[in-house]
């Protein structure tokens, strides 16, 4: 009250009488509380994905970051010493999807080093082991032993191992380092012991202690913080990332699976780079490790409604994006097949299907049991969208009726896209739609009846992105209480609202494109917000039925009743 004497004037204790009518029970969805992960705010590379080396693939490009010329293939790399040079080459790469690699021309043995400081430094823990790997070959000379050091910011070596780079063809080398002390901002140092010209790529450093101990896994403390929410599902990879900035930037799930060196990196529309080391297979594994349903989201044949990028296509026709265009119709059959192939990758027989075999080759012969798939995200419901969405929806429904398709109704709780999106869902019989809205706490207080009047015969609702926003965008007690209050109304409408997920989820200090977020972090700390504990309260104490009740207050204030 001292902080806000106007709004909280004349507050007094309130006595409430609650009468429960057990005969008016509604089932609450078992999937009500989940999480939505998008690579925004460095949520993946430099965040949840445990890789410690930045730009390990030498694929950074100025177009990742608004044509920033410093954001290039050598970003995050430096040469220590004057007797070596670093350049970038593209002849005979490891894989066409990974065309750039480093050429480290060493003219003085043992005196020069190739350095990488990771994402704002490399955090290390004393006694813990780290997996190092690189692909290398010798372009000139014989090559030889290469020292690999972990170096603290004062220059002290706090971990060392060695590999041999002598092959004339690409060959992967692996080693393990043990940190001899803690470090907050260490660097990786690669020191050739022989004068030669080396080609290097996919230089990686991974903690062995990842979430559930998985190789190519997730940062243990961040992943555990998410798991502690007890999410019933995970929506991924976006959001705007899913349908991208222009057609060429649509998230191609096939480019995110398979050997890491063969994955296709992608510009992140939030202004940085996606290695896609955290790809679809890893998302499925994360869901499995938490006991959560996977909810992948694929573009509905159109890019993000805010796209500013133009793209060339198969007929060299310049097509400007946004919702002014979509995937050319002559390419839609292949795109639809890609959607169907994803379902086969998740659920297909490991011996009898092409993509089921690929899943097994990745180490997971058992199906992931995919039950939901999102098509579209906050799209403008234009004729271009409708035509393509219908094609995809009909194909999935015909081939996989067991999979629930989740449609979209735009980015707001009202307006043209919301109304037309709902009309389209009703016309096609879409079983669930994805609603998004970011609103003031007052809206949540005064719209607790929002879903009371929804037609129960129509599509179920997935409230896929929501949050209470105040001026300055804090995540505080006021926003958390408003969200908690609104979730009680959502539970009351558990026969309509099937799923909910707060957004955004993660934000790294110094690399934030959006506020508020549920969890803030740096390389050594994870800081859940007040809103996190609202989500955790509902996730860890999920109800199965809503019992109708009435509340009587001793002061009769309706304004207070809305907040109880």
Question: What residues fall within each predicted segment?
Answer:
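Catalytic-core region of carbohydrate-active enzymes that cleave or remodel glycosidic bonds
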Residues: 285-286, 390-404, 422-541
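Carbohydrate-binding surface patches
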Residues: 562-564
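Active-site groove signature of glycoside hydrolases
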Residues: 191-193, 207, 237-240, 297-305, ...
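An active-site-proximal structural segment forming one wall of the substrate-binding cleft
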Residues: 177-189, 195, 210-231, 275-290, ...
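Active-site beta-loop-alpha junctions enriched in small/polar residues
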Residues: 38-40, 236-241, 299-301, 375-380, ...
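Hydrophobic faces of well-ordered beta-strands that scaffold small-molecule active sites
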Residues: 31-37, 232-236, 294-298, 371-375, ...
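Conserved, mostly hydrophobic/aromatic
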Residues: 35, 58, 134, 230, ...
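Extracellular and organelle-lumenal recognition/adhesion modules and their flexible linkers in secreted
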Residues: 1-276, 293-295, 310-322, 328-333, ...
């Amino acid at each position: 009250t001292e902080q806000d004497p106007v709004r909280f004037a004349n507050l007094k204790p309130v006595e409430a009488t609650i009468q429960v009518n057990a005969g008016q029970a509604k089932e609450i969805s078992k999937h009500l509380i989940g999480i939505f992960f998008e690579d925004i705010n460095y949520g993946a590379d430099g965040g949840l994905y445990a890789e410690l080396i930045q730009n390990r693939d030498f694929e950074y490009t100025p177009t990742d970051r608004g044509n920033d010329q410093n954001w290039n293939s050598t970003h995050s790399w430096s040469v220590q010493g004057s007797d070596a040079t670093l350049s970038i080459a593209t002849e005979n790469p490891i894989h066409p999807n990974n065309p750039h690699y480093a050429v480290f021309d060493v003219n003085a043995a043992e005196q020069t080093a190739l350095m990488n400081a990771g994402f704002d430094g490399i955090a290390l823990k004393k006694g813990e082991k780290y997996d190092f790997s690189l692909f290398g070959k010798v372009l000139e000379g014989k090559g030889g032993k290469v020292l690999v050091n972990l170096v603290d910011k004062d220059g002290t070596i706090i971990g060392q191992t060695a590999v041999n780079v002598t092959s004339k063809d690409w060959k992967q080398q692996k080693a393990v380092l043990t940190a001899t002390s803690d470090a907050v901002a260490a660097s990786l140092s690669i020191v050739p012991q022989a004068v030669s010209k080396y080609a290097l790529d996919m230089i990686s450093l991974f903690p062995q202690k990842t979430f559930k101990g998985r190789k190519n896994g997730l940062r243990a403390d961040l992943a555990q913080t998410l798991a502690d929410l007890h999410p019933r599902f995970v929506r991924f990879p976006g959001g705007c990332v899913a349908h991208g900035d222009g057609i060429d930037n649509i998230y191609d799930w096939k480019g995110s699976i398979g050997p890491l060196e063969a994955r296709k990196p992608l510009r992140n529309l939030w202004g940085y780079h996606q290695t896609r080391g955290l790809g679809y297979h890893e998302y499925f594994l994360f869901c499995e490790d938490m006991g959560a349903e996977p909810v992948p989201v694929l573009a509905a044949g159109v890019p993000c409604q805010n796209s500013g990028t133009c793209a060339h296509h198969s007929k060299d026709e310049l097509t400007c994006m946004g919702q002014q265009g979509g995937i050319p119709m002559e390419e839609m059959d292949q795109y639809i097949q890609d959607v169907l192939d994803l379902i086969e990758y998740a659920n297909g027989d490991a011996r009898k299907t092409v993509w089921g075999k690929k899943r097994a080759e990745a180490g997971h012969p058992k199906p992931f049991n995919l039950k939901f798939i999102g098509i579209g995200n906050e799209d403008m419901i234009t004729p271009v969208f409708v035509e393509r969405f219908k094609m995809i929806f009909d194909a999935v429904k015909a081939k996989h009726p067991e999979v629930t398709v989740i449609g979209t109704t735009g980015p707001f709780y009202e307006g043209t896209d919301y109304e037309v999106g709902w009309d389209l869902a009703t016309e096609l019989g879409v079983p669930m739609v994805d609603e998004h809205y970011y609103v003031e706490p007052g809206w949540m207080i005064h719209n607790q009846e929002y879903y009371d009047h929804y037609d129960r015969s129509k599509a179920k609702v997935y409230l896929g992105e929501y949050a209470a926003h105040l001026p300055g965008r804090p995540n505080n007690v006021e926003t958390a209480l408003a969200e908690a209050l609104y979730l009680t109304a959502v539970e009351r409408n558990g026969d309509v609202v099937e799923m909910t997920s707060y957004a955004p989820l993660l934000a790294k200090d110094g690399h934030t494109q959006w506020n508020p977020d549920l969890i803030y972090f740096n390389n050594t700390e994870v800081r859940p917000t007040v809103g996190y504990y609202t989500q955790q309260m509902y996730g860890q104490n999920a109800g199965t039925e809503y019992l109708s009740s009435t509340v009587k207050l001793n002061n009769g204030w309706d304004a207070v009743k809305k907040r109880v």
